[in-house]
UniProtKB/Swiss-Prot annotation:
Protein name, UniProt field: Fusicoccin H C-9 hydroxylase
Organism: Phomopsis amygdali (Fusicoccum amygdali)
GO molecular function: heme binding; iron ion binding; monooxygenase activity; oxidoreductase activity, acting on paired donors, with incorporation or reduction of molecular oxygen
Keywords on record: Glycoprotein, Heme, Iron, Membrane, Metal-binding, Monooxygenase, Oxidoreductase, Transmembrane, Transmembrane helix
Cross-referenced InterPro entries: Cyt_P450 (IPR001128), Cyt_P450_CS (IPR017972), Cyt_P450_E_grp-IV (IPR002403), Cyt_P450_sf (IPR036396)
EC number(s) from the headed UniProt entry: 1.-.-.-
Co-factor(s): heme
Disruption phenotype: Accumulates fusicoccin H.
Length: 518
């Protein structure tokens, strides 16, 4: 029998042929997957196919969403070309398909929206990796409980923050609505993450503001480069260097604070062990993070920015809009004061008293309905084919958002542009008695806080802060919009509001309140 041998050249040719065959198979496979995806997407109408829409416009423009559905020929899903690629806009009719987040990745969507692989964007990576659920647990189960048990401290910090920005002048004077609300919200929320000294440190608060601003403005300029080059380009790009410097400024404040708190926690635990006492519970932000991290190393400055960016923006945006809505409806201000005077007449902050501020709760829900934080929600990337109704499929690899246009649908909310807090009571009692009407509740008809697994975990904390802040404003200040702004529904970053300290605060002296949990 003949003996066959393989020369070195033949072995190399065989290896090269195998590699080429594998690469060809991968290319063909990817090509087929791409064509299959395009075929599935072709079932949905494309909005203005020759136009590339800024992704920020899609996220915020109710008019764009309305036009998209109007041009979609009755389809409940349509496509739009944006600066981050093609995005599917899905009707809230299908929201239940995404309740549990199966097959959806919010982190993958963020990767297309921001250059989070670049140095300086670590807080966004921190919020989207395995820490995502840990952060949600901390906010929902630890932070919410902490603020519930420390209402007096919350009231004191709100009082200080409000007086520092709106002053005690009894003469009418103009203040920047957005800037003052941002500062008040930042100081108050940071009190529960840090301490009184740091939350009142203007340099520290400004370092957080600077990072947040740069991340969403200058930092976006990196998106002009291919994503694979972001880590390299960031080493030389001025915007990325500015962002990294802003993060370092936050670290200068946070690192010493964390070292101090860890030392204090260790000291208390050591003393308890020495005396045979039970280990004291460290109910504070540093301890929560260390507990979640276990033996894993993490950057506390990155963690702080990750927690802060979202809370500043959402709560500030909401409070600005709420005050504008109330200023346009001054009769409701007096009704709110009457309700608070009755509910809080025993001069205590309690869980039950917050729950009984029903008119305030409905005003907040209505203001959020009129101007939610965005026009779309549940921004995600499909990790697999997601089947919805009537054979509709969200193809794997597709970017998609769920529209919030039901919040302005006249079939659900008659006269949808009207500020009518009573509609939520009627909606719950008449049309859908099983629908929750509370400000923090979520539903397909009201996705101001998101929906399902994507619901904002900080909404209970934010609602508590907002209710107490509004109560302080109602009894301590008069406020109104300047002439010419009364018919402008949505506030702008440049909007000013006229305020003056009340000479008589009425029956409630909020600064003398007690706190009893019942």
């Amino acid at each position: 029998m003949a003996k066959f041998t393989v020369t070195s050249l033949e072995r190399h040719l065989l290896l090269i042929s195998t590699v080429i065959a594998v690469l060809a198979a991968l290319i063909v496979s990817r090509g087929c997957n791409y064509l299959l995806k395009r075929w599935k997407l072709s079932a949905y109408p494309l909005y203005e196919d020759k136009k590339v829409t800024p992704i920020e416009e899609l996220h915020s423009s109710r008019d764009l969403i309305a036009k998209g559905f109007a041009k979609s020929q009755g389809k409940e899903i349509w496509r739009i070309n944006t600066t981050i690629g093609e995005v599917l806009v899905v009707s809230p009719k299908y929201i239940e398909k995404f309740r549990y987040g199966h097959g959806c990745s919010a982190a993958a969507y963020t990767e297309r929206e921001l250059p989070i692989s670049a140095p300086g964007y670590e807080p966004f990576t921190f919020a989207s990796n395995e820490w995502r659920q840990r952060n949600a647990d901390i906010i929902l189960h630890r932070l919410t409980g902490l603020v519930s048990n420390r209402k007096i401290e919350l009231s004191e910090e709100l009082s200080n923050a409000l007086e520092s920005r709106w002053t005690n002048s009894t003469d009418w004077h103009a203040v920047s609505l957005f800037q003052t609300m941002t500062a008040i919200v930042a100081q108050t929320t940071q009190y529960f993450f840090t301490n009184r000294e740091l939350c009142r440190n203007d340099a520290y608060i400004q370092s957080l503001f600077a990072y947040s601003s740069l991340a969403f403005t200058e930092g976006r300029s990196l998106m002009k480069w291919p994503r694979v080059l972001h880590p390299l380009v960031a080493r030389f790009h001025p915007a990325s260097q500015n962002l990294q410097s802003a993060l370092e400024n936050v670290n200068k404040h946070i690192f010493p604070f964390v070292r101090e708190r860890r030392a204090e926690i260790s000291r208390r635990r050591f003393e308890a062990a020495q005396s045979g006492k039970e280990t004291p519970l460290a109910d504070e932000w540093v301890a929560w993070l260390d507990e979640k991290a276990g033996n894993e190393d993490y950057n506390p400055g990155v963690a702080m920015v990750s927690f802060s960016v979202a809370s500043f923006h959402t709560t500030t945006d909401f409070m600005c809009q709420l005050l504008c809505d109330l200023a346009r409806n001054p009769a409701i201000i007096e009704q709110l004061k009457e309700e608070a005077s009755d509910v809080l007449r025993d001069h205590t902050w309690t869980k039950s008293s917050f729950a009984r501020l029903d008119l305030m709760d409905r005003c907040m829900k209505e203001s959020q309905r009129l101007k939610p934080i965005g026009a779309v929600f549940l921004k995600s990337r499909a990790q697999k084919d997601i089947s919805v109704e009537n054979g509709n499929i969200i193809p794997a690899g597709s970017l998609f958002v769920v529209s919030g246009h039901w919040m302005h649908d006249p079939a659900i909310y008659p006269e949808p542009e009207k500020f009518d807090p009573g509609r939520h009571l009627r909606h719950a009692e008449e049309s859908k008695p099983n629908k929750p009407k509370q400000f923090t509740a979520v539903s397909p008809e009201h996705m101001g806080w998101g929906y399902g697994k994507h619901s904002c975990p900080g909404r209970f904390f934010a609602a508590t802060v907002a209710k107490m802040l509004l109560t302080h404003i109602l009894f301590k200040y008069e406020f109104k919009l300047p002439d010419g702004k009364l018919n402008q529904h949505a506030y702008e970053f440049t909007t000013e509001i006229l305020v003056r300290r009340r000479i008589e605060e009425g029956a409630l002296n909020l600064d003398s309140f007690d706190s009893i949990d019942r």
